[in-house]
């Protein structure tokens, strides 16, 4: 018979409930699922033990649901023996940067749509981003409106988006680094 796992509490050493052990195993399996969804280059950056890396790569190849479920349980079992905190922290950093990137992308799309639809939006954009070349933006807005009215592909709209991205990513004027 296997000895029960125990946990130190303020009342001494108590056995860990089966429910808690199952919840911990499920959490490790969820991390394993996340690992299987990562591209290989990110997996290699995580510095995983070789057995775990092999198991994750094997899970990526498996197509059978039953076999994949067993492989995920195996990955969860391997993860019980390692410290998962650094892995979870790195995954959260990657997820945070991805979320920030999506939010920035949506803000740029909103600016582009407002500029195309609303005449007064350009002055707001210029006041927020003073390093904007207004004439270039006006030309792209005008062309995007024409293309939309004619039912043509949104070439100027894409160019406007690229220009807005370069403007918003550029440092504000007066904050340029000096090369000493």
Curated annotation (Swiss-Prot):
Superkingdom, taxonomy of origin: Bacteria
InterPro entries from the UniProt entry: DarP (IPR006839), DarP_sf (IPR023153)
Gene Ontology terms, MF aspect: ribosome binding; rRNA binding
CDD domains (UniProt xref): YjgA-like
GO CC term, one of those recorded: cytosol
Record-linked SUPFAM superfamilies: PSPTO4464-like
Primary location recorded for the protein, binned into one broad class: cytoplasm
Biased segments, Basic and acidic residues type: 1-13
Described purpose of this protein according to its UniProt entry: Member of a network of 50S ribosomal subunit biogenesis factors which assembles along the 30S-50S interface, preventing incorrect 23S rRNA structures from forming. Promotes peptidyl transferase center (PTC) maturation.
Protein name per Swiss-Prot or TrEMBL: Dual-action ribosomal maturation protein DarP
Organism: Methylobacillus flagellatus (strain ATCC 51484 / DSM 6875 / VKM B-1610 / KT)
């Amino acid at each position: 018979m296997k000895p029960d796992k125990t946990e130190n509490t303020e009342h001494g050493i108590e056995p860990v409930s089966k429910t808690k052990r199952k919840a911990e195993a499920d959490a490790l399996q969820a991390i394993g699922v996340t690992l299987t969804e990562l591209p290989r280059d990110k997996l290699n950056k995580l510095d995983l033990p070789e057995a775990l890396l092999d198991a994750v790569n094997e899970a990526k190849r498996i197509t059978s649901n039953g076999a994949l479920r067993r492989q995920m349980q195996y990955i969860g079992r391997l993860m019980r023996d390692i410290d998962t905190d650094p892995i979870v922290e790195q995954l959260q950093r990657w997820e945070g940067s991805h979320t920030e990137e999506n939010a920035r992308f949506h803000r740029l799309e909103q600016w582009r749509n407002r500029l195309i639809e609303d005449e007064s939006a350009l002055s707001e954009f210029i006041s927020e981003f003073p390093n904007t070349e207004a004439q270039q933006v006006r030309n792209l807005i005008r062309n995007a409106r024409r293309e939309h009215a004619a039912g043509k592909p949104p070439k100027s709209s894409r160019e406007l988006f690229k220009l807005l991205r370069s403007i918003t990513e550029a440092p504000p004027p007066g904050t340029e680094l000096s090369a000493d």
